Amino acid sequence: MYSAKNRFVQAVQRLQDFKNMYDYDARLATFADWPFTENCKCTPESMAKAGFVHCPTENEPDVACCFFCLKELEGWEPDDDPWTEHSKRSANCGFLSLTKCVNDLTMEGFLRLEGDRIKSFYRKFSTVVLQYVEEEMTAATKRLLEYFSNQHHCSIDLDH
């Protein structure tokens, strides 16, 4: 099982990796190995237009994640419509509610949108962040108690 630190690092890395995914072509490029390419609704183009990034794993080659709300969907079938599936499972996604192209937003509009994306990240990963902080605090407390115990040649009960 991953430690909270590993999950935290992975979550922050995903937030960083996805910051450039406002660009349709960047999202589309992630679908190079997408299993559905023609004669279906969930082509790479339609997936990228709906805000998805292809995030395959060894066991799940069709995992797609919205770069904005971080909703992961898998088990795609040829007749699945990316916009419909996305809105069914993440109706409050800020990307879905855009009324114009990201490139047409004002600086204020873009900053508001990016703020919403970061809020989505914290909503999804807040427990991971808190668990990581708690583990770090516990480890720091233990190190300090051990240090002072060694400095003053006394024993300190770490359980109380």
Curated annotation (Swiss-Prot):
Residue positions, PTM Phosphothreonine: 43
Induction and repression of expression: By progesterone.
Protein name as annotated: Baculoviral IAP repeat-containing protein 5.1-A
GO BP field: chromosome segregation; mitotic cytokinesis; mitotic spindle organization; negative regulation of apoptotic process; negative regulation of DNA-templated transcription; spindle assembly
Record-stated family: Belongs to the IAP family.
MF terms (GO), sorted A to Z: metal ion binding; protein kinase binding; small GTPase binding
Naturally occurring in which organism (per UniProt): Xenopus laevis (African clawed frog)
Record note on modification: Ubiquitination is required for centrosome-targeting.
Subunit structure: Component of the CPC at least composed of survivin/birc5, incenp, cdca8/borealin and/or cdca9/dasra-A, and aurkb/aurora-B. Interacts directly with incenp (via N-terminus), and may weakly interact with aurkb (via N-terminus) to stabilize the complex. Interacts with GTP-bound ran in both the S and M phases of the cell cycle. Also found in a complex with ubiquitin-mediated signaling proteins including at least usp9x/xFAM, nploc4/npl4 and ufd1.
Keyword GTP-binding: no
Residue ranges crossing the lipid bilayer per the database entry: none
Ranges for the BIR repeats: 27-97
GO CC term (a single one): spindle midzone
Domain text: C-terminus is required for spindle assembly.
Keyword entries, A-Z: Cell cycle, Cell division, Centromere, Chromosome, Chromosome partition, Cytoplasm, Cytoskeleton, Metal-binding, Mitosis, Nucleus, Phosphoprotein, Ubl conjugation, Zinc
Lineage: superkingdom: Eukaryota
Subcellular location: Cytoplasm; Nucleus; Chromosome; Chromosome, Centromere
Ligand binding (Zn(2+)): 66, 69, 86, 93
Function: Component of the chromosomal passenger complex (CPC), a complex that acts as a key regulator of mitosis. The CPC complex has essential functions at the centromere in ensuring correct chromosome alignment and segregation and is required for chromatin-induced microtubule stabilization and spindle assembly. Stimulates the mitotic kinase activity of aurkb/aurora-B in the CPC. Does not appear to exhibit anti-apoptotic activity.
